[in-house]
C-alpha cells in the first residue's frame, strides 16, 4: 500500500520541478520504484508493536524533454 503512495509523491515532486523549468516540455516515463521498511522505535522490548516506522523509497525514471523555446516564424 505504501509503494503506490510513495510513487505518487515522487511523481508530484518531479511534476512541480518540470513546471518550474521554462521553455522545456518533459514527459516522465518508465518509473521503477523500490522501497524498504523498518521499525525505528519499538513500543516495548518484545518487538511486538512498532512506534516509529522508517520507509525508504528510491525511484528511477526516464524524462523525455523537448526544447520548446521561442521558435515561431512571426
Swiss-Prot record:
Q: Name one GO cellular component term.
A: extracellular region
Q: Which residues form the signal peptide?
A: 1-26
| Cysteine-cysteine disulfides | 26-50, 33-59, 39-61
Q: Might you name a Gene Ontology BP term for this protein?
A: defense response to fungus
Q: What is its main location?
A: secreted
Its transmembrane ranges are none
Q: Does the keyword Secreted apply?
A: yes
Q: Which UniProt keywords apply?
A: Antimicrobial, Disulfide bond, Fungicide, Plant defense, Secreted, Signal
Keyword Secreted recorded: yes
Q: Where in the cell is it found?
A: Secreted
Please state which protein family the record places this protein in: Belongs to the DEFL family.
Q: What is this protein called?
A: Putative defensin-like protein 12
Native source organism of the sequence: Arabidopsis thaliana (Mouse-ear cress)
Amino acid at each position: 500500500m505504501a509503494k503506490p503512495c510513495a510513487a505518487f509523491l515522487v511523481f508530484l515532486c518531479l511534476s512541480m520541478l518540470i513546471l518550474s523549468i521554462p521553455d522545456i516540455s518533459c514527459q516522465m516515463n518508465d518509473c521503477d520504484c523500490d522501497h524498504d521498511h523498518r521499525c525505528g522505535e519499538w513500543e516495548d522490548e518484545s518487538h511486538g508493536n512498532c512506534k516509529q516506522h522508517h520507509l525508504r523509497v528510491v525511484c528511477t525514471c526516464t524524462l523525455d524533454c523537448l526544447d520548446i523555446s521561442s521558435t515561431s516564424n512571426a
